[in-house]
Amino acid sequence: MRIKKLLTTMVLSVSMVMALTACGSGAKETDSSAEEKKVLKVGMECMNAPYNWSQTDDSNGAVKISGSDEYVNGYDVMIAKKIAEENGYELEISKIEWDGLIMAVQSDNINAIIAGMSATDERKESVDFSSNYYEATHVVIVRSDNAFADAKTLDDLAGCSATSQQGTTMYDSSIDQIKDVDKLEALPDIPSLIVAVDSGRVDVGIVEKPMALAAIATNPDLKMIEFEDGKGFDVDEGITSIAVAVKKGNSDILNACNKTLDAMTKEEKDELMEKAISIQPATDSE
């Protein structure tokens, strides 16, 4: 009888140990899986077509904006999705005003800026940049019936009124190259700039070529002026180089971005940009 009780006790003890071991193993697996979960937290304006814009549904591959009922789509979103998918990251996109993007990545609220941002020397003092994911020349948008609509060189714009988006190289540098320019106050975003030009409040707006193509595609009264080499804006290569910005020293995200971007051809990037322009909404929803 004593032996039977002893055997029963031993069996129960072994069962408990096995159960505890299994629970411990499950907890470790759960912890390990949580540790392995990687999230690419991207910041962008969500109102800078064709790079990025907000919309009300997930059509054409749009991504839900974190903390919002809206979705975001555009060239930047396509690039972000490609980087995330090819490097095993979940993608999370936050809507952040342009002037707050660098601060957001520095404070770890996001870990990447994919927002049509050019890799200028000044910005390189604050963040690290990936390889380029687009080359964007500076061009002019103007109403077709404006006095400066037939400009062929920068000199032909002499005396015009001009503006661009605040905090951009177009406003800080390119506009000043126009002789006798009436430089108006910078505008907060591209939709505001398009409205200003279309309404005649300003003669010309200086933007990157993709944004100009997007603007004229949805605003029939506007035209784009792209000057021939040597006849337009003198812009450093770094200013036209669009890249992903990350917090200084964040080599994991930077290497992941470069792995994907370095493998992309110019043709692939151009195709994505053409797709973004073709699916953009008539107006950004703000």
Where are these regions (language model features)?
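C-terminal motif of bacterial Sec signal peptides marking the signal peptidase cleavage site
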Residues: M18-A22
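Extracytoplasmic small-molecule ligand-binding "clamshell" domains
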Residues: A34-M117
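Short helix-initiation/N-cap motifs at beta->coil->alpha
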Residues: Y75, E92-V105, A149, L184-S199, ...
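Acidic, polar ligand-binding/catalytic clefts
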Residues: E85, E90-D156, V235-E237
